[in-house]
């Protein structure tokens, strides 16, 4: 067992407080399983210089512990080739008492004796023991599985996009145009990877041809009969790839002519289409102009009212202006008259809708007033109408009298009483 063990300090300066003797680190440790020469090992501090010598091994001290990793070269039986007896005798008389002999001053003699003993060791006996792993070297050269986890290099997927493949195929053709089947065949001939799973990548090729503006579909000419149309590159696509490198495109090509043509066609449809709303408005205005030019401007009282609002216009119309100015005046009056009628509404139709702009934009005082008189009158009328409906003939005068709604129900105050809060709040 160990003797007294002293604690080490955190700093090297504190060690002098713990250890009185510089050579004292631990008490001497007797080792029972060592030979007689190494019966009493010295302290840890004195063994450090011995461990620094790289040539000193357990075999040099004849320490008989067996390790399979050391092999036969360093086993006790293999030490006979080293001349263990002669080597140990050459170490001097200090070997039997290693406790006093293993001091830093005597280590040089031990190292020189060890080097002399190691020189006599043959390399043939060290090969088996000094192997890199220390184990049997036959396990390193294991046979690999027959299954390959990677494709061979020629059958790897090429680093090109489908657009690059199509562009390469078209540019390699003498006529600069190919059919769909010819594009398929060119890709399969050049890249063996695409000889498998043909349906998948062929669908991708068709999609790339259809949804990219850089490819144009050309119909077959009569002198070239066959199936399928030709595909070629757009003349304005230019050099889509950087310096002929098909790994990456510079930018996506978009045909501006097709977009402009579509916009022009849409504009023509808007302007000249017979069913377009703009065409209808122009047609109505032209019809109104022709009808107003044929009629007399003084015949309509509304035109006179508008003329009366402007005092300067009255004498000009009465004095008989030129035909051109009168035609312009007639057209402006007719348009103003139509807009006035549209905004004013039908004079015979006196019903005011509850959601009209006049009721929605009413004053705040009228919004909070609740007039239930008209609402009660309407309820009484409808209740009496429903009660007397069963025993009355269809042609009775009371039936016709009840069928007409009194004017009180048509007033705006009736609906203002029903809807206590306005729908549109302008405050």
UniProtKB/Swiss-Prot annotation:
From its record, what is one biological process in GO terms? regulation of transcription by RNA polymerase II
The induction field says:
By activin.
Stretches the record annotates as Disordered: 256-336
Q: Could you tell me in which tissues this protein is expressed?
A: Present in the vegetal pole and marginal zone but not the animal pole of gastrulae and in equal levels in the dorsal and ventral halves of both gastrulae and neurulae. At neurula stage, expressed in the notochord. During tailbud stages, expressed in the foregut, brain, hypocord, neural floor plate and in two lines of cells just dorsal and ventral to the notochord. Expressed in the adult liver.
Q: Indicate, by first and last residue, each region the UniProt record lists as having compositional bias (Polar residues).
A: 323-334
Transmembrane segments in this chain: where? none
Q: What is this protein called?
A: Forkhead box protein A1-B
Briefly, what is this protein's role?
Probable transcription factor.
Keywords of the record, alphabetical order, are: DNA-binding, Nucleus, Transcription, Transcription regulation
Native source organism of the sequence: Xenopus laevis (African clawed frog)
Which Gene3D superfamilies does the UniProt record give? Winged helix-like DNA-binding domain superfamily/Winged helix DNA-binding domain
- Report any Pfam family annotated for this entry: Forkhead
Q: What is its main location?
A: nucleus
| Record SMART domains | FH
Any one annotated GO CC term: nucleus
Comp. bias regions, Basic and acidic residues: 256-272
Q: Which residues bind DNA?
A: 157-251
Key word Nucleus present: yes
> What PANTHER family does UniProt report for this protein, alphabetically?
FORKHEAD BOX PROTEIN (PTHR11829), HEPATOCYTE NUCLEAR FACTOR 3-ALPHA (PTHR11829:SF195)
Keyword Nucleus belongs to the record:
yes
Compartment(s) where it occurs, according to its Swiss-Prot or TrEMBL record: Nucleus
Q: Which Gene Ontology molecular function entries are recorded, alphabetically?
A: DNA binding; DNA-binding transcription factor activity; DNA-binding transcription factor activity, RNA polymerase II-specific; protein domain specific binding; RNA polymerase II cis-regulatory region sequence-specific DNA binding
From start to end residue, where is composition biased (Low complexity)?
A: 285-302
